[in-house]
């Protein structure tokens, strides 16, 4: 039985099925989250998830069940339950450092440290850029460009680990470029 992180059946998860270490088939869970293995004989059965339906992450460890001769002779059933968690989400928020108002148009580079994920995102009018269902990994988030009149801080990189089911937020703040206004008047206008 394949369940999601809320204990509801999860259809469409694909598993390799092994008996005593030998591949005997590949099956997908049905609408009720189940795979039924028929003609079972005594031995160790291992279920290795090959793919999980979006937005879930596949299991990183196999699920095992031993079927003994008493179960086979008695026509019994062995139930194995596997539970998936959703892939993580990341919200990047950009604020003006002085007035804390959102800043639209900031471009961020997101790099997965271990598995090669890479994407650039731009903050919207609410100052946010949202990444949904991204791989479980540690990420470096770096500001690439900012709209005028803000000052780019190229050393402003934040690192975050996103685990299964996480919904995290990073906040970046920038100062505006200082402005100097010079007014030229003649001596008669003092």
Language model regions located:
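Solvent-exposed loop/turn and edge beta-strand elements of beta-rich ligand-binding domains
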Residues: 1-190
């Amino acid at each position: 039985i394949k369940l999601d992180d809320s204990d509801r059946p999860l259809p469409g998860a694909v598993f390799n099925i092994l008996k005593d270490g030998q591949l005997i088939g590949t099956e997908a869970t049905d609408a009720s989250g189940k795979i039924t293995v028929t003609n079972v004989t005594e031995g160790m059965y291992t279920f290795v998830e090959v793919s999980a339906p979006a937005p879930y992450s596949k299991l990183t460890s196999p699920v095992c069940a031993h079927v003994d001769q008493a179960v086979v002779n008695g026509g019994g059933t062995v139930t194995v339950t596997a539970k998936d968690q959703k892939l993580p989400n990341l919200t990047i928020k950009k604020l003006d450092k002085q007035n804390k108002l959102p800043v639209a148009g900031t471009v961020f580079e997101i790099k997965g440290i271990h598995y090669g994920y890479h994407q650039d995102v731009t903050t919207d009018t609410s100052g946010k850029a949202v990444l949904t269902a991204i791989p479980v990994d540690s990420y470096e988030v770096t500001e690439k460009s900012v709209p005028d009149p803000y000052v780019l801080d190229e050393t402003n990189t934040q690192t975050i680990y996103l685990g299964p089911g996480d919904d995290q937020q990073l906040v970046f703040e920038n100062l505006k470029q200082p402005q100097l206004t010079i007014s030229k008047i003649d001596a008669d206008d003092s």
